Every structure is written in structure tokens, then in C-alpha cells.
């Protein structure tokens, strides 16, 4: 369905996403504002009379869950301020946001299983009372043994597998969930597995297997698949996309306009990954003139060093702060490959002037950086002599790392590099960061 809309402007697509009464499958690149779009669509549906209890929003992490709640509240408050006629009704909605079913997939599956467990327990209690003679207690006979065997059998299954099996076997429960959740949203679709997608489709389709009207909103980006190791798991997203393209009441749209990064970064990222990723789609910068004022310098740089990388990192950050004293901890994001290095770099920066709590928000393993961004992103341990196999495994993680930057991307290049192979990314050709000179 994207083909018929290929000449739509990015703005036209966004307007359509906010208000269209369609099932939507969105492929959204980094910095495209998907969280804001999703939140705005939910607000429009709330203003249209949809009850908060009818929404199910699946996020990949607990941090994303909280971010969605805050974004929806933010849009509600903004609407309250400008819409006097609806302000009284919307104020009541604000307090219900925290009670909405906005959760991770694991939490949702556990919730479904708990609903069934409660229902089963109540039914067993009723049966015991009905079967027992007056003055007698029901004996735990063969039925309890069967229950124990079933319990042991289920213990080897993941929570998603148990949930999906339950929905397949208990059609009455599935119908209740379909009735309760008329608006289903799924974020980070590229990192969901086949079982999780099957659960979504079970809820979003009717008894005949047809997609329910205006029920499902899915968003993801295959370039940011970092939690799927096996090739068949990475293929799940594309299989789902193909399936949705064949549905008459599903629209598939691409968003590639980057509102996060400046043109220098966007152009470099496109050039670096266009040949590295299958079916790569270029991003397009969308920045206002005042956007560049948010950071005192801009560009993609390298900083080479010899000796300890922790010392080199501390010296680099100290130089930047000395040159631009107005910068704060929120302007920095420092990314590395491992938990051990994360702690090492935090300790290395302890004398720079940032508090421990500030460093906890600045230094991350790269795979934990999704959803984060900063004016200045420093990539540590860059320039490694990666093998072909290592490169394939790391490419998507490297893409996630560099797309966190808004204005400045710095590769700290030393002697014990682990990723961003110089052979593939041409780091040696980048301008070396020398503060004090005009960049």
C-alpha cells in the first residue's frame, strides 16, 4: 500500500498517521518522532471518545513505557490549555493515563496468565463446593495430579509461549481480550519474535482471521534490530511487513525525515551505512535554522590517542567543557561495547565534575542507548580490525549508536579498538577534533 502513496510528502504521511482510521504498519527511521506521532494519534482517539481502558500499548522496555505515559500526558495537557470546550472532560483523562495498559510484552503476557489463573482458581473453588457432601471437604484426587503435570509442562515454556498457547486454547478468553482492547499499539516491532507477533495478530483479528477495523498500529525499523541474533528471527519483521501489505485494511508507510540530527551527521550516516545494510533507505534532515544554536560546534570527528582509553576519554571531555563551559551533562552521551567498560568509563570521568547520578545518565552500553539522544555522542574503542563475521553482527548496533547524536559525533580511536572497523567506516579520513580552532 506504500506504493500508491510514494509521492506523498513526509508531512502528508504524518497527518494521515495522526488521524487515519486504518490499521497502520510504519517503518520509521531514527529521529523521525515516532513516539510523538504515536502519542498524538492516541490523543486524537481519546478526544474522539475512545475509552482509556480500550488501549493496549506494547513497548520494548520499562523506560519506553514511562516515556509513552509522559508523552500522552504532555499532549493531553497541551490540548487542555487550548481547547476550553473539552478541557473538563480531558482533565479526567489525565489521571487515568497511569492506569492504561501500557506495558512491556512480558508484563502483558504475565497479566493475561494472571487473569486466567484467577478465573481458574475461582472455578475450582466453585467446583469443590458443589462436589463436596455437606460437612465434607473435597479430596485432592486425580484432578490435582493432572494440574501438577500441566504446571510442570508449562514451566519449560517462555511466558510468551504460555500466553500464546492459552489464547489458542481458550477462545472465550481471547474474545474477551478482543472486546476489551480495540486499540492496540506495538513499538520496536523489529525486536519482537514470531510468538509475540502471533499474539498481536490473535488480538487484532476477528474470528475469521480478518484484521479488525482501525485496531492495530505497529512501528519499527529493521535497521535497528539488535536483539535478534538468528537470521530467521531478523526475517520476522519482513515477513510481517509482507503479510500486512497483502491486507486490504492495512496501510504500510515509511518515515525517513530525521528531526533529531543536523545535515552533516545525517549525510555521513547515510554514506556510511548505505553500502552496509540491505535495502537501506536514506534519511533526510529536517532542521530549522535555530536548530544549530542548540550546540556550539557540529560535525563528525575522530580523536586518536595512545595509552589508556579511560584517560583519553577524560581528557577529551575536559577539553570540550573547557572550550564550551556552558555545556551540561545532558549534552553528552558516551557509548561503549560492554558492561565492564561502562563502569570503567564512569570511574574515569569521576574527576571531571559530573556527579555519579549524572554519569549514570551519560555512559551506556550501546545496546541500552535506544530511545536516548544527546547533542554530543562519543563512541569509545572505535576503529577496530573487525572480521567479516563480527562486522555483520555489529552493523545494526553501530547504526543505533551513531543515530543517537544530534550535532556532534566523535570516534575515540586508540590501540585496543572493538568496533567501527576503520576499513568500513573510513574513520582515518575524518577531521581530527582539535578544540580551540574553528571546526
Enumerate the language-model features and the residues they cover.
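Conserved RecA-like helicase ATPase core segment
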Residues: 7, 197-302, 422-436
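A short beta-strand element within the Helicase C-terminal
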Residues: 364, 368-385
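C-terminal accessory regions
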Residues: 381-438
